[in-house]
Swiss-Prot record:
Glycan-carrying positions: N254
Domain Disintegrin: 400-484
Major location category of this protein: secreted
Peptidase M12B domain location: 194-392
EC number: 3.4.24.-
UniProt: Ca(2+) 1 binding residues: E197, D281, C387, N390
Protein keywords: Calcium, Cell adhesion impairing toxin, Disulfide bond, Glycoprotein, Hemostasis impairing toxin, Hydrolase, Metal-binding, Metalloprotease, Platelet aggregation inhibiting toxin, Protease, Pyrrolidone carboxylic acid, Secreted, Signal, Toxin, Zinc, Zymogen
Gene Ontology process terms (BP): proteolysis
Organism annotation: Trimeresurus stejnegeri (Chinese green tree viper)
More details: The disintegrin domain belongs to the long disintegrin subfamily.
Positions annotated as propeptide: 21-192
Database matches in Gene3D superfamilies: Collagenase (Catalytic Domain), Disintegrin domain
Subcellular location: Secreted
UniProt name for this protein: Zinc metalloproteinase-disintegrin stejnitin
Amino acid sequence: MIQVLLVTICLAVFPYQGNSIILESGNVNDYEVVYPRKVTALPKGAVQPKYEDAMQYEFKVNGEPVVLHLEKNKGLFSEDYSETHYSPDGREITTYPSVEDHCYYHGRIQNDADLTASISACNGLKGYFKLQGETYLIEPLKLPDSEAHAVFKYENVEKEDEAPKMCGVTETNWESDEPIKKASQLNLTPDEQRFIELVIVADHRMYTKYDGDETEISSKIYEIANDLNVIFRALYIHVALIGLEIWPSGELCNVTLSADDTLDSFAEWTKRDLQKRKRHDNAQLLTGMIFNEKIEGRAYKKTMCHWKRSVGIVRDHRTRPHFVANRMAHGLGHNLGINHDGDSCTCGANSCIMSATVSNDPSSRFSDCSLNQYSSDIIHNPYTSRCLYNGPWKTDIVSPPVCGNYYVEVGEDCDCGPPANCQNRCCDAATCRLTPGSQCAEGLCCEQCRFSTEGKLCREAKGDWNNDYCSGQSGDCPRNPFRA
């Protein structure tokens, strides 16, 4: 019998609030100190796993109690995830580490409209969550024999450089005569789920910046990938880390002050080297280089799935992984073909992912313009989406399945989320099985829990694709081949 694990951690607020402190996230003004105290509701004698699949944290923010629900990001790594390092004499060393019992989580604050949290539980609690529209960070205080953590607003972190920063992609502003749909009205369904199998490469400047600590670099990349999953949920895109590479002995492509030249050189390297030994949909270079003209990153536009140009480059900020993830998401957005936001585009935050100017308060949201462009055009473009159908599928994602996480995994017919949130009458949220009499729970060929009739048009021809028709045997809309 499968036992449901409930972990509650009570965080008692320290008797005082600090005014200023130097943390891993940087210099922080105005923070709260809390002490995690873990209480586990496990049967007597049960073996507690190192990192639970689901956890709950209760603590106070500004004197108000909140409940943080966390669930392990089971799809963070693909099944054939690998790490490539290099020996001092330049020999390539590729390993396939066991990543099933990792410590990276997604979550939400109970009863808060913004379902956003990204947390590492590897050594204490480190990450961010959204509460009442504001971004809060939590991280351990490095005190001897202490479980103390700091909780603080993102806006209270002193920025290393307040000057405006730019995206290196130009002439891509949103322009449309069509009325902009609100995000809640977009026709994005689980049937349109896509997957980006991502390789992240840390260059030699990253290696020297982190004093050769490859473990710290890898942890930073895991945090970034975990954040990317939170960001791309709105597009029904799952980002799976399929490879990580670190360059300890020197740059393997030309990394210069010019973001354009660096991007071109990295693209050439992926063509002549990476593609021959590691399948992937997209590769991103994380660099310690500070580019000219305050450029934070660069990416080719509308090149996702391209044999050579499905790449991007992003400047690292050591203390701000969420900021780096925001910039990498921006570049991936351009790879997909998403334009910069115009003045009329909104996302309910101070800035959105595809804003042309980089905000010091990074967003986790795509604007209504981005969502509209993606759902109405990009998702149906065979050139920029053809590689995003092939997984990792439910048989490829590492870690045991968990019912209620919105992902249909091995042994499940459907997954509409927790019972309190499920709005799909075809799916039993408690068991992730179809309800009695139902043939399907979702898909373009699923109507009122039954398969659509064979031959029904489910997706019109577009570009090089033929019309797609229901088979009568599945709720999914099968892809027909390219036109001759």
